[in-house]
């Protein structure tokens, strides 16, 4: 086994659990495209492993995917994901932009897909209720297909968001499952 120690293997496997991602302040991205997106983003990439350097068997042991990917990286989490007061929410909104607010998304694949679609539509940022699935869950990260590095994401109370947007003169639009067409 060249290029990776047993301790690194244990560490990488532990990052599949939220507890260890939170303690270490990092998350894992897998696949050539995702690693390339991480490297060209403003996120700090701590280390990259490539299948040709560590071997297919080792990559299969550390991957969270059903089949080993050719590359894997550990990326530092941004520090401003959880916002707890109106001032922080106002600063995250900035002067202008198009934002999406999400209320309690529970499925990791759905959140990742929403982030990917938001990126495609040019959404500047996403705000989600604090009980929404964790952004750095491996299934969320994979489903974003790199959009996690391009769309700002914050957890906050949506009432704080509505208040901050309103005081900044922003317009709010909402959708409801039982709403009426306009």
Q: Regions from the language model: what does each represent?
A:
Residues 74-90:
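Glycine-/acidic-rich phosphate or pyrophosphate-binding loops and their flanking alpha/beta elements
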Residues 182:
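Short clusters of hydrophobic/aromatic residues that line enzyme substrate/ligand-binding pockets
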Residues 53-78:
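Glycine/small-residue-rich loop that forms an oxyanion/phosphate-binding "nest" at active or ligand-binding sites
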Residues 22, 41, 68, 168-169:
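Structured helix-beta-strand junction loops
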Residues 85-86, 90-179:
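RNA substrate-binding interface of SAM-dependent RNA methyltransferases
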Residues 37-38, 62, 144:
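Residues that scaffold the ATP/ADP-binding catalytic core of kinase and kinase-like folds
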Residues 1-50, 132-133:
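Boundary-proximal intrinsically disordered activation/regulatory segments immediately upstream
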């Amino acid at each position: 086994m060249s290029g990776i120690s047993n301790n690194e293997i244990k560490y990488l496997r532990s990052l599949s659990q939220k507890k260890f991602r939170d303690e270490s302040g990092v998350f894992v991205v897998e696949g050539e495209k995702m690693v390339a997106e991480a490297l060209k983003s403003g996120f700090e990439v701590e280390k990259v492993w490539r299948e040709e350097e560590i071997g297919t068997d080792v990559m299969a042991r550390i991957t969270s995917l059903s089949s080993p990917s050719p590359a894997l990286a550990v990326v530092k989490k941004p520090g401003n994901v959880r916002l707890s007061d109106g001032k922080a929410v106002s600063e995250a909104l900035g002067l202008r932009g198009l934002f999406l607010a999400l209320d309690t998304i529970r499925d990791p694949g759905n959140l990742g897909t929403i982030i990917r679609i938001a990126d495609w539509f040019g959404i500047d940022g996403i705000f989600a209720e604090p009980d929404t699935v964790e952004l750095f869950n491996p299934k969320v990260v994979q489903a974003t297909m790199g959009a996690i590095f391009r769309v700002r994401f914050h957890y906050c109370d949506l009432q704080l968001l509505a208040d901050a947007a309103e005081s900044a003169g922003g317009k709010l639009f909402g959708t409801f499952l039982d709403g009426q067409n306009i």
